[in-house]
């Protein structure tokens, strides 16, 4: 069973790294770690966007889990168990034009958050008529040279998701209000989007 924890204020503490210098867990503990990560991975796919980033960090240590990673896995599981009775009241926003569905995408990223490889992490959340239907926390494949570039990469991934969802909705005869709004908080990334030819 899980040791008793105070209810964590957040699901994760910070970045994890798989290091050759740190001792690895016993084979039994390694199996427990992978099973625990598998359980929380299932949750983020279906109902717990709040733990997405913490679980993404846990997956980095699947090949060699360390005591620090195991402790973080227990923290995430404690957070899930101790917040299982909490929830969000979902109340869809009725569009002014009931024939059109409203989509809003929120996109964000850190910059070079992983000190080992300097790669950034993209985060996104897609709301359909005010209800969160798609979310993701994912490490970027390339190294961004600035915070604006990291945001720009995150936006490009978010827009791919928007295009996919719009295509799915329109394939079942649901019309989407256009243009779809993408919320971003870095002016440099907004400039790059509006002037894509100058940033290529």
Predicted regions and their residues:
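Long, low-complexity, charge-biased intrinsically disordered regions
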Residues: 1-200
């Amino acid at each position: 069973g899980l040791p008793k924890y105070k209810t964590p204020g957040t699901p994760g503490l910070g970045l994890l790294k798989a290091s050759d210098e740190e001792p690895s867990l016993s084979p039994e503990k390694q199996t427990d770690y992978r099973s625990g990560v598998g359980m929380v991975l299932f949750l983020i796919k279906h109902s717990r966007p709040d733990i997405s980033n913490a679980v993404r960090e846990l997956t980095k240590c699947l090949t060699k889990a360390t005591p620090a990673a195991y402790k973080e896995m227990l923290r995430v599981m404690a957070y899930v168990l101790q917040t299982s009775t909490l929830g969000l009241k979902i109340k869809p926003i009725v569009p002014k034009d009931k024939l059109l569905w409203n989509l809003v995408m929120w996109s964000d990223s850190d910059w070079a958050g992983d000190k080992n490889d300097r790669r950034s992490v993209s985060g996104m959340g897609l709301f359909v008529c005010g209800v969160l239907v798609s979310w993701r926390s994912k490490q970027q494949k390339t190294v961004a040279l600035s915070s604006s570039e990291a945001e720009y990469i995150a936006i490009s991934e978010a827009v791919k998701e928007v295009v996919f969802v719009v295509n799915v909705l329109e394939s079942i005869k649901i019309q989407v209000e256009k243009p779809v709004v993408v919320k971003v908080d870095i002016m440099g990334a907004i400039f790059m989007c509006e002037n894509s030819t100058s940033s290529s």
